[in-house]
């Protein structure tokens, strides 16, 4: 090395390890409208001060590394670094705190959830100085959200395509989820749609297995859709799962669905990946297909209260990546979901502007500007007795999906669909007449069952079925 080079490298540079808080903890920082803001629940190792742990999160998820490097002098760290700008305690948790981190917009590629998550929820989650780390919420500024297409169509366009207004949409997941032949599968689809459902659905793990290859399933389901439409005079759909082992195969399945003329396809966005999902969402908008999203694998990421990522962040990411429906819990069924928290991320999916509300877990005000909304899907362990609560909790802009609650009807699939449609229409009418579904819901169902034998039979079968476990996802 020449003396000249040694001099250059040594000016303003001292090798060694610095405390992160000297550079990345900046409580005086005033956040900008263009910053991406994150709220992390941090559990540091014993002896690590909160300021150092919060600064470490900001550093490792932006420009920092474990030691000082001389190439820091070749760029403007003040322009690009993440900043831990606030720290607050977590009530009832002495070893945890919330670290608020601001990221400058230039750190992220436009229109890429993949790049956003690679930084913010990347290697930092394995950092040894932290015992656990959870991303509770993100504020996505309009300057960044406008670089995304978002949902292929959105709520209003979907209603216009289906010509269905003033009520939640009704769906059913075909069961058993695995093992049926394509023809028997199509038969179940037809019976459910003929009975009054708007949609039927592939289960998340139905792709293209030996017992039912995807092309056969698509053809028989399309036949079922057209036959049910002709008999009922209503537009029908089946969520044809295009998820595949490669993006090329996924797109081939979506193209075939479009050629069949069906209205909607489906994707498992977490197991399939954000890059694949965004590609499919763009194809769906360009070709008039609705896109149903399943969240398989989400609980691996969001179930633990002190580590991982809250589903409200995954929901925001999906709205940017693209989807017209996404599963979001039921509050009353078999799957995890506390009411206020669930409705918090339901609003983040549907609404244009959502105010900060810590009681519902919403850490930041979120302005989606003109990005279309996503219909939340309530699915998992629900039946006709849940219909009043679901109608009251989720309102009209939702999809209520009954799998076992349709196909488990003692008289068969079509009567199961009839029971659900009658229960829904009765609840919507009662609500529109000013009745309180929270208090009078069971009576509304009993009254409707007097003139619907299908509903009466369903009420008898599921009158004792409850899923009463304490929710894990609490504030």
Curated annotation (Swiss-Prot):
Subcellular location: Plastid, Chloroplast
InterPro entries from the UniProt entry: RuBisCO, RuBisCo_large_chain_AS, RuBisCO_lsu_C, RuBisCO_lsu_C_sf, RuBisCO_lsu_fd_N, RuBisCO_lsu_N_sf, RuBisCO_lsuI
Binding locations of substrate: 123, 173, 177, 295, 327, 379
Active site: 175, 294
Residues the record lists as N6,N6,N6-trimethyllysine modifications: 14
Site feature location: Transition state stabilizer: 334
PTM annotation, UniProt: The disulfide bond which can form in the large chain dimeric partners within the hexadecamer appears to be associated with oxidative stress and protein turnover.
Organism: Picea pungens
GO biological process terms held by the UniProt record: photorespiration; reductive pentose-phosphate cycle
Binding positions (Mg(2+)): 201, 203-204
Family annotation (PANTHER family): RIBULOSE BISPHOSPHATE CARBOXYLASE (PTHR42704), RIBULOSE BISPHOSPHATE CARBOXYLASE LARGE CHAIN (PTHR42704:SF15)
Positions of transmembrane segments: none
Enzyme class at the top of the EC tree: lyase
Cofactor: Mg(2+)
Location of N-acetylproline modifications: 3
Signal sequence, renumbered to the chain: none
Modified residues (N6-carboxylysine): 201
One example GO MF annotation: monooxygenase activity
Pfam families hit by this protein: RuBisCO_large, RuBisCO_large_N
Keyword terms: Acetylation, Calvin cycle, Carbon dioxide fixation, Chloroplast, Disulfide bond, Lyase, Magnesium, Metal-binding, Methylation, Monooxygenase, Oxidoreductase, Photorespiration, Photosynthesis, Plastid
Enzyme Commission number: 4.1.1.39
Protein name, UniProt field: Ribulose bisphosphate carboxylase large chain
Additional note from the record: The basic functional RuBisCO is composed of a large chain homodimer in a 'head-to-tail' conformation. In form I RuBisCO this homodimer is arranged in a barrel-like tetramer with the small subunits forming a tetrameric 'cap' on each end of the 'barrel'.
Pro-peptide region(s): 1-2
Subunit structure: Heterohexadecamer of 8 large chains and 8 small chains; disulfide-linked. The disulfide link is formed within the large subunit homodimers.
């Amino acid at each position: 090395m020449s003396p000249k080079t040694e001099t250059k490298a040594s000016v303003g540079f001292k090798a060694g390890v610095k405390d992160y808080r000297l550079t990345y903890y900046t409580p005086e920082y005033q956040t900008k409208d263009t910053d991406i803001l994150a709220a992390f629940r941090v559990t540091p190792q014993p002896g690590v001060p909160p300021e150092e742990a919060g600064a470490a999160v900001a550093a490792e998820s932006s420009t920092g590394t474990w030691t000082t490097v001389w190439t820091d002098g070749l760029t403007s760290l003040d322009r690009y670094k993440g900043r831990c700008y606030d720290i607050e305690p977590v009530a009832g948790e002495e070893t945890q705190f919330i670290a608020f981190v601001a990221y400058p917009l230039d750190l992220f590629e436009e229109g890429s959830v993949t790049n956003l998550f690679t930084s913010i929820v990347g290697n930092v989650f394995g950092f040894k100085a932290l015992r656990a780390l959870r991303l509770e919420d993100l504020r996505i500024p309009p300057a960044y959200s406008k670089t995304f297409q978002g949902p292929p169509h959105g709520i209003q366009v979907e209603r216009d395509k289906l010509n269905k207004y003033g009520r939640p949409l009704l769906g059913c997941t075909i069961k058993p989820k695995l093992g049926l032949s394509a023809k028997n599968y199509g038969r179940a689809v037809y019976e459910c749609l003929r009975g009054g459902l708007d949609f039927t659905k592939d289960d998340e793990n139905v792709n293209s297995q030996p017992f039912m290859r995807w092309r056969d399933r698509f053809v028989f389901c399309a036949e079922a859709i057209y036959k049910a439409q002709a008999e009922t005079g209503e537009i029908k759909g089946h969520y044809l799962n295009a998820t595949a082992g490669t993006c090329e195969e996924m797109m081939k399945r979506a193209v075939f669905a479009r050629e069949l003329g069906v209205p909607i396809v489906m994707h498992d966005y977490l197991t399939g990946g954000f890059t694949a999902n965004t590609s499919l969402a763009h194809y769906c908008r360009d070709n008039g297909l609705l896109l149903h999203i399943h969240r398989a694998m989400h609980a691996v990421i969001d179930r633990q209260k002190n580590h991982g990522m809250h589903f409200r962040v995954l929901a925001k990411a999906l709205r940017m990546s693209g989807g017209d429906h996404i599963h979001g819990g039921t509050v009353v069924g078999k799957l995890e979901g506390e009411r206020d928290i669930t409705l918090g991320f339901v609003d983040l999916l549907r609404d244009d502007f959502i105010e900060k509300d810590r009681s519902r877990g919403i850490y930041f005000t979120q302005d989606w500007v003109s990005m279309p909304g996503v219909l939340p899907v309530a699915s998992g362990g629900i039946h006709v007795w849940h219909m009043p609560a679901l109608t009251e909790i989720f309102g009209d802009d939702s999809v209520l999906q009954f799998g076992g609650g349709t196909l488990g009807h003692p008289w068969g699939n079509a009567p199961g669909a009839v029971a659900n449609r009658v229960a829904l229409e009765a609840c919507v009418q009662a609500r529109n007449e000013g009745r309180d579904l929270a208090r009078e819901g069971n009576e509304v169902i009993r009254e409707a069952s007097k003139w619907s034998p299908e509903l009466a039979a369903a009420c008898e079968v599921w009158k004792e079925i409850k899923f009463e476990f304490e929710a894990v996802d609490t504030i």
